[in-house]
Amino acid sequence: MFGAIAKALFGSANDRYIKSLRRIVEKVNSFEPSVSALDDDGLARQTVLFRERLAKGETLDQLLPEAFATVREASKRTLGQRHYDVQIIGGIVLHRGEIAEMRTGEGKTLVATLACYLNALEGKGVHVVTVNDYLAKRDAEQMGQVYRFLGLTVGVVMPNISDEERRQAYLADITYATNNELGFDYLRDNMKYTREQMVQRPFNYAIIDEVDSILIDEARTPLIISGPTDDKSDLYIAIDQVVKKLGSDDYEIDEKQKNVVLTEEGTERAEQFLKADGLLPEGNLYDFENTQIVHHLNQALRANLMFRRDVDYLVRNNKVVIIDEFTGRMMDGRRWSEGLHQAIEAKEGVQIEPENQTLASITFQNYFRLYPRIAGMTGTAATEATEFHQIYKMNVVTIPTNLPVQRKDENDQFYKNLEDKFRAIAKSIKEHAASGQPILVGTVSIEKSELLSEYLRHEGVPHKVLNARYHEMEAHIVAQAGRLGAVTIATNMAGRGTDIQLGGNADFRIADELREMTEGPERDAAIIRIKKEVAEEKQKVLDAGGLFVLGTERHESRRIDNQLRGRSGRQGDPGLSRFYLSLDDDLLRIFGSQTMFAKMMNKSLADGEAIVSPIMSKAIETAQRKVEARNYDIRKQVVEYDDVMNDQRKVIYEQRATVMDAESVNDLVEEMREDTIADLVSETCPEDQYVEQWDIDQLKEKALDLLNLDLPVKEWQEEEGIDSEIIAERILEKSDELLAERSKDIPPEQWAGIQKNTLLQAIDHHWKEHLSVLDSLRQIIHLRAYAQQTPINEYKHEAFALFERMLISIREDVTRNLSRIELFQPSFELSELPEFFKNSPEIMAALEEQEKLLFETTVDGQNQPQDDQITVNQMAAQQGAAAQTDSLSDADPAHWVGKISRNAPCPCGSGKRYKHCHGAFDSKN
């Protein structure tokens, strides 16, 4: 009560903060006359002057008023848009690294130009992060006009562009990209072998558009770069068939946790089916050796009973594609982990892709915390202000609207069941559409959107459906959703980032209708006509009440509901919003108090009749708060566990960077070898043991394995006065001699390259294995709670021990591989190659690279390429053969392999022996 009185008297903390920023806005406005008086060249020269002032010691904060005035003027001249005072406030908030909550239609994209320009003056790069590629490209093109006018460079990172194009985009003053592209480029960069191959430069400042979507909604989904593992398709199919034989009494479903567990009877039946199919040996399903079978069985249960087609995923082109639960968009390239995706593929009978092993991963929480400064923009962030502050240390500032909001938000309407609700929705849509009022209908899934579409077809109401099936025209459909009488059904926040303009979007109409028309007076007249029609149609829509937003269901998060409401009433336009709910809705069914709702519904409520109750609306909000709190706990837990991996990731990535930047890693490699020898001797010949107790057999075996040395350790053991220190010195001396012999014919710069690549390969290999082990540990660590232990503390302890073990393995691998380096001399000259090899740039480049290195790693005397990589000779032979696949004949060189004596003349007529001509590659293949 006292808080409400204080707020009424003094205003909220947000109001007071906004008031303090208005003084800076006045300074910006004071520069407007002088900046407006500059000609185009003078305005563009401002950038040079600002950078000179920065170099002399001025700060960005000191430059802010004049820089913002410069951007405002450049925007007027290039886009015809002048920043409002409230947009200047938004720019200040972004520059300060805070989150600007701005209502839909208030011009967030334009606001970003202020902070982008100011922070780009330092020349360290600014990243503008968007939720999809369309918005990245659109904003880079539109706002790029302002930046280029002022002499700044603009880049945009799109899928499928080359590394060189990415590198140039990141070198630009301002770079537009999606959160996924940025994150994956970071992971890929940290798998490269030279600095020159990397595409990103050091992070500086980022503005995240739709920050709640990226840092909240996607926070539970880590970015993962993975590689394939063994194919287990038959196992997935067999276990899926077992699950399909189970009945409803065999399992219990927990919809809140999206989990399924077998009952006692279900376990017995599952065991019978698994044994009958030969998947389970004699014994209990939950015996230790059956852990993998239990895991796959659990995933198959979840796939069949918890994940719904056209709700959680859809099947497109014989592939299972995940549907984003918050946006309703398809998430191409994303796959559920831990075998769940494969279980769903088995359920749907589509091709089962192999499981993947994690090569590198990071969450968005930890990726964006790599930036020294980040800021964010969104229409809805206040409900998550606590989370933004606790995890990202960012304050949420609500920016006032330029004009008062005139949208009317009506109370929720409750119906007994889904059928009554959809009938009422269809009737309401028909009535409002008849008056010319445009309607945006929000649904939670493809399934519901298509069900409602059937009801509207039955009522004869023309409409458009926008969901993951029809996503290609998303921006166009949403942009025209404000036309007179338009009815648009959209899943969740499809089209986010595209304004719904009343009367339609003139630019989209011009692009669509005048696509075939060439420049000239006729086209100019058509543009004027379209703009006039749009203005007239807008007035009719305003007279009809503006955009009507109709929600068919409450989302788990109040924020998503607020986003849907926010599509209406932009820039002071009138509007209407209303939600229709029923007892069958997931939120009420899973999280709400159904008993209370059912009692209120049954009180003299006829079929098809609605009830409007503040008590029920409050109960809905309570249910949403419960879900939000649960989801926040999940995200917080994800951060806690990923922070453990993040600390280790930083160490590994910093180590890689140090190795790549070093001219020579010889000292580091020598230190690793010495430590490996010291550990070996300490393990087998402890100082506190008698010589007779030493494990000489293990010492001999490990010296051969790690150092490629066959040592007379038994003779050493029998010497008078021998001790572990002498043993270590002798082993190091022998190892030095071996390496000196191995490297004597290799030029120093090439030996340095060999050492560096060997070290990087070892780091990457063991980091990959370490990630896999941490994944497994993460899945089972919660069981420690049953032993009265704190899972996160146990995870930290064990992860640290595993990390130390990994560092030792890296050290041993580097020592082992460098001890086996051998010089490999090719049996041919490049000039002697046959023509069909010379015509392949890939083969020639590979062979030239081999000529430079002239070495190959061997193990136990057998040439074996590491990590399943083919040797250069094999690659040349394979590519040469592949190039000839379409035209093989007896006269073809590819048919001569194995049929001609190596010392016989080559059939090609060169006059050389076969082994020095076309047979040069037969020796290896």
Swiss-Prot record:
Subcellular localization: Cell inner membrane; Cytoplasm
Membrane topology of the entry: Peripheral membrane protein
Record Pfam families: P-loop_SecA (PF21090), SEC-C (PF02810), SecA_DEAD (PF07517), SecA_PP_bind (PF01043), SecA_SW (PF07516)
The protein's required cofactors: Zn(2+)
Annotated residues for binding of ATP: 87, 105-109, 499
InterPro entries xref list: Helicase_ATP-bd (IPR014001), Helicase_C-like (IPR001650), P-loop_NTPase (IPR027417), SEC_C_motif (IPR004027), SecA (IPR000185), SecA_CS (IPR020937), SecA_DEAD (IPR011115), SecA_motor_DEAD (IPR014018)
Cofactor remark from the record: May bind 1 zinc ion per subunit.
Source superkingdom: Bacteria
GO cellular component, as recorded: cell envelope Sec protein transport complex; cytosol; plasma membrane
Gene Ontology molecular function terms on file: ATP binding; metal ion binding; protein-exporting ATPase activity
Sites where the protein binds Zn(2+): 906, 908, 917-918
Catalytic reaction(s) noted: ATP + H2O + cellular proteinSide 1 = ADP + phosphate + cellular proteinSide 2
GO biological process: intracellular protein transmembrane transport; protein import; protein targeting; protein transport by the Sec complex
PANTHER family: CHLOROPLAST PROTEIN-TRANSPORTING ATPASE, SECA INNER MEMBRANE COMPONENT OF SEC PROTEIN SECRETION SYSTEM
Subunit structure: Monomer and homodimer. Part of the essential Sec protein translocation apparatus which comprises SecA, SecYEG and auxiliary proteins SecDF-YajC and YidC.
HAMAP family for this protein: SecA
Name of the protein in question: Protein translocase subunit SecA
Annotated organism of origin: Zymomonas mobilis subsp. mobilis (strain ATCC 31821 / ZM4 / CP4)
Lineage: Bacteria, Pseudomonadati, Pseudomonadota, Alphaproteobacteria, Sphingomonadales
